[in-house]
């Protein structure tokens, strides 16, 4: 099917035609509707991208779609699902998957992602991203779910590593081994959430650097950064919560620096979903990520020049 035919089909269906904005090497932020006027009036914000939660746009129309359409006309968009329950024990919700696929078709996002987690059981929905045991049975089931999603949306899915607050005795492999197995079986890409790595490493007492060294970086198509909250568990020990309600912590920036030094610039999204600040604050976080990536990219270019010389 030619590009002209695809455009004609979209026009017949009343689907807007959007430009194919590149996302490689860019930093972005969560898109919040209250920021739209400030974004449209911001002459300094010219090169980033925005991420939206798919479930906020599963209605037929109205203000949410009008706002997202304006953003998509000028910027790359990352579509991030939070309710697919890919890690759950039961079949995927076909209606939810169809609505997700319709959004992919409508907005042609640069990036499409979901979580390695579950949120439904029987007819009950839990408003959270819950962990799963890392076993061969779980690996097979999650791989089947990923393959189903990829077949329906017609493109690879990026799968996000979770933040966790407990571990399962039933697990027979590490999280990174489980994720590598999913990549092998499905060909999916990965969304590396560095804040999640730091939160889980702190809560469970393992090395975030060791985790990253074992992570299949060659398959990472997007990075997430976010803020977290420090609490105490029942025994008085430090417990980190992936709260997305404050600036990125220094320790997470340092891990991000390590990853970009190793892999080069990867599309990076700063999440902020609670206690949402004014647009300039969120923009400043994304600009910090962009500056770090640009610095490493400049270093790589300089090294290439030296080698060629």
From Swiss-Prot:
Gene3D superfamilies named among the record's database cross-references: Divalent-metal-dependent TIM barrel enzymes
Q: Do you know which Pfam families this protein is assigned to?
A: MbnB_TglH_ChrH
- UniProt keyword terms in alphabetical order: Plasmid
What NCBIfam families is this protein classified in? PRK05409.1 (NF003818)
Family from the record: Belongs to the UPF0276 family.
| The protein, known as | UPF0276 protein RB0508
């Amino acid at each position: 099917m030619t590009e002209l035919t695809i455009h004609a089909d979209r026009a017949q269906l009343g689907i807007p035609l959007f430009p194919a904005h590149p996302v490689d090497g860019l930093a972005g932020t969560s898109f919040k509707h209250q920021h739209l006027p400030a974004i449209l009036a911001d002459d300094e914000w010219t090169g980033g991208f925005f991420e939206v939660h798919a479930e906020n746009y599963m209605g037929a129309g109205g203000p949410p779609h009008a706002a997202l359409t304006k953003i998509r006309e000028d910027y790359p968009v990352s579509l991030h699902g939070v309710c697919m329950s890919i890690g759950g024990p039961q079949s995927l919700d076909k209606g939810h998957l169809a609505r997700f696929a319709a959004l992919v078709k409508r907005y042609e996002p640069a990036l499409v992602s979901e979580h390695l987690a579950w949120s439904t059981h029987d007819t009950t929905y839990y408003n959270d991203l819950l962990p799963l045991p890392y076993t061969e049975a779980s690996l097979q089931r999650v791989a089947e779910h990923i393959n189903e999603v990829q077949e329906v949306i017609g493109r690879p899915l990026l799968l996000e590593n979770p933040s966790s607050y407990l571990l399962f005795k039933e697990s027979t492999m590490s999280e990174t081994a489980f994720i590598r197995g999913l990549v092998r079986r499905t060909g999916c890409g990965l969304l590396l959430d560095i804040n999640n790595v730091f939160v889980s490493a702190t809560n469970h007492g393992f090395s975030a650097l060791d985790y990253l060294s074992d992570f299949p970086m060659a398959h990472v198509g997007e990075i997430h950064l976010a803020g977290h909250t420090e609490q105490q568990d029942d025994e008085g020990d430090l417990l980190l919560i992936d709260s997305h309600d404050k600036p990125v912590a220094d320790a997470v920036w340092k891990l991000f620096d390590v990853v970009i030094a190793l892999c080069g610039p990867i599309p990076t999204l700063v999440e902020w979903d609670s206690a949402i600040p004014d647009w300039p604050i969120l923009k400043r976080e994304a600009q910090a990520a962009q500056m770090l990536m640009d610095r490493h990219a400049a270093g790589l270019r300089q090294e290439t020049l030296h080698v060629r010389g």
